[in-house]
């Protein structure tokens, strides 16, 4: 088992938005362990949806690469754990 990381991503509430993020994660071989989709929390603005992803990565280096890739793609996210 690799290193686990949980991230919260704020997406535009439109068809295909989650797929775009999942495709980016897949391109770096991140294993998605859990997905929680939330439109109702107070921290989710109108027209957006919050998604919490639990990911398995190979090691710390792989996790750092994944986080940098999301930043480079201007994906609105924060690391929770």
Report the location of each language-model feature.
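A conserved regulatory-domain signal marking ACT and ACT-like small-molecule sensing domains
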Residues: 1-81
């Amino acid at each position: 088992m690799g290193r686990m990381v949980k991230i919260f991503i704020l997406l535009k509430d439109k068809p295909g938005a989650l797929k775009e993020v999942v495709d980016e994660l897949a391109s770096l071989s991140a294993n998605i362990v859990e997905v929680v989709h939330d439109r109702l929390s107070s921290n989710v603005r109108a027209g957006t949806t919050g998604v919490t992803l639990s990911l398995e990565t190979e090691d710390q280096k792989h996790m750092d690469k994944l986080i940098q890739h999301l930043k480079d793609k201007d994906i609105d996210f924060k690391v929770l754990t």
